Amino acid sequence: MIHDPNDAGLPDQLPTPSSEAENSPAGDTTPPEEALHRRRIRSFVTRAGRVSTGQRRAMDELGPRFVVPFAPQQPDWNSVFGREAPRVLEIGFGMGATTAEIASHRPDEDFLGVEVHEPGVGALLKLMGEQNLSNIRIIQHDAVEVLEQMIAPDSLDGVHIFFPDPWHKARHHKRRLIQPKFVALLVSRLKPGAYLHCATDWQNYAEQMLEVLGAEPSLKNTADGYAPRPEYRPVTKFERRGLRLGHGVWDLVFRKRGAG
């Protein structure tokens, strides 16, 4: 989910995942495999949000066509999109403005957006209706489970992860999305030669991203460190505000080894 970089206190208001031993009830008989699945890092933290009338209308009218229900099986994505085309996954599209803009400028590619928060889903559907975009599909579910169960290995042409929650406090860094195990899962779904593009406005997170992505043997950095912002990624309103305040933004673009 795209965060507001100026809302630095927000993570402290969020519920803490019950992954610590003291949060487990006495005598818990949960099987070890199930308990491990329950405790692992998820790609999101639940936030409340109000769905506007326009967003709700878009969900009612366009959701049946463009929202793909989560299912523990791999759909025929060519049938879902109605064609065979390069496919890009975006994890955490926030309110969808960036997703819609990129999709509008790349009509020959298909975009699969994963977002758990309902207002964001409604907002993107509303933009799709206003701009007559048909090359986007949405899954409202945890990205980890989507990758594991709905995306085939070596099938994606690109992945976008723009401004994920930075979990700015050191004790919360373990909750960050870009971790070695998640990156390994992500890379397994990329085609050889496909790209992974991450962006963040937190320098500490950018440094962690660079370290984690650089340590993944299947990835190669396209730049000497951080990459210039690719032209296809628009500057967000939060980014503009941050830049006016002197804040930095870091883009990282890696490719999966093995092409050609």
UniProtKB/Swiss-Prot annotation:
Pathway info: tRNA modification; N(7)-methylguanine-tRNA biosynthesis
Which Pfam families does its entry note? Methyltransf_4
Binding-site positions, S-adenosyl-L-methionine: 90, 115, 142, 165
Q: Which GO terms describe its cellular component?
A: tRNA methyltransferase complex
Question: Which GO molecular function annotation, any one, does this entry have?
Answer: tRNA (guanine(46)-N7)-methyltransferase activity
Q: Which UniProt keywords apply?
A: Methyltransferase, S-adenosyl-L-methionine, Transferase, tRNA processing
Is Plastid there in the keyword field? no
As recorded in UniProt, coiled-coil segments are none
What InterPro entries is this protein classified in? SAM-dependent_MTases_sf (IPR029063), tRNA_(Gua-N-7)_MeTrfase_Trmb (IPR003358), tRNA_methyltr_TrmB_bact (IPR055361)
Annotated binding of substrate, by residue: 169, 201, 236-239
Active site at 165
Query: Which Enzyme Commission numbers does its entry carry?
Result: 2.1.1.33
Entry superkingdom:
Bacteria
Q: Which reaction does it catalyse?
A: guanosine(46) in tRNA + S-adenosyl-L-methionine = N(7)-methylguanosine(46) in tRNA + S-adenosyl-L-homocysteine
- Return the annotated region ranges for Disordered: 1-37
- NCBIfam families per the UniProt record, alphabetical: tRNA (guanosine(46)-N7)-methyltransferase TrmB
What job does the chain carry out? Answer: Catalyzes the formation of N(7)-methylguanine at position 46 (m7G46) in tRNA.
Q: Which family does it belong to?
A: Belongs to the class I-like SAM-binding methyltransferase superfamily. TrmB family.
User: What name appears for this protein in its UniProt entry?
Assistant: tRNA (guanine-N(7)-)-methyltransferase
